[in-house]
């Protein structure tokens, strides 16, 4: 087995790249037809998502103003408000960034924006995923332990605050690992291509593998697992209540009204989990495939590659339709 390069060799290689290395002009990436279609669809979904989420936010604000003066927003609507804000953040950062980057192909915004926008991109991806977890946990507690949740009214606010904090902290490494590299023409003198990448930010290959796995787990695996567990608990509780003796069920309805008023909770949380799974699975399947087999991009057709990535942009479009239908 061949020995891996020493840290000194890696450092020299990275220094050569940062000082501009020769690159054949024919090897430079270009905006293909499928790339143009991706850009068009991306900006269409951007307008759609921005309209849906902003409209729901305004509708929620108008609904709040109609309430009695000084009355606080209900816990569920507070959670939906933060999920809408998180989706709006993802819409306003990730979609335009992806669209413009596909148009320009290379990075023209400089080192500072390379780091800052990479941080904001991941932050705005963490936030909706964590808010979905908060809503799933809250709805599960509302069904399985309603009295305990009602006695502690600050649980929802605490989980929301924690979700925003974790999103900010977990995205922090982006400020360090992303950097500019410059590639030169065959003479090695004139810079012909610049890109914002993580190249040479990790001293060992497994450091990057660990970071990729951590990010993948926090963005997809862990939120999906928690949502599935919460949905399973809700289904189990509602099924048990619905199969009670009719006389006993009538008595229970006067206490918690689970069968009628909270049945839509199950439908909404299942719809959230389904939307999350359907929209993000193709994106992460492609990412994992590339992680284990970088050459797959040479075998996978360009249209299929772009199509898989576009799936992720559907999630912030679907969410306002789901919680708008079930909550208002």
Swiss-Prot record:
Extracellular-side segments = 1-38, 98-115, 185-212, 301-306
Record-given protein name: Gonadotropin-releasing hormone receptor
Which tissues is this protein detected in according to the database? Pituitary, ovary, testis, breast and prostate but not in liver and spleen.
The annotated topology with respect to the bilayer is:
Multi-pass membrane protein
Q: Which GO terms describe its molecular function?
A: gonadotropin-releasing hormone receptor activity
Species annotation: Homo sapiens
Topology Cytoplasmic: residue spans: 59-77, 138-164, 233-281, 327-328
* Annotated localization: Cell membrane
Whichever gene encodes this chain, its name is: GNRHR
Keywords linked to the UniProt accession:
Cell membrane, Disease variant, Disulfide bond, G-protein coupled receptor, Glycoprotein, Hypogonadotropic hypogonadism, Membrane, Receptor, Transducer, Transmembrane, Transmembrane helix
Which residues are listed as membrane-spanning? 39-58, 78-97, 116-137, 165-184, 213-232, 282-300, 307-326
Query: Which disease annotation does the entry carry?
Result: Hypogonadotropic hypogonadism 7 with or without anosmia: A disorder characterized by absent or incomplete sexual maturation by the age of 18 years, in conjunction with low levels of circulating gonadotropins and testosterone and no other abnormalities of the hypothalamic-pituitary axis. In some cases, it is associated with non-reproductive phenotypes, such as anosmia, cleft palate, and sensorineural hearing loss. Anosmia or hyposmia is related to the absence or hypoplasia of the olfactory bulbs and tracts.
Q: Name one Pfam family in it.
A: 7tm_1
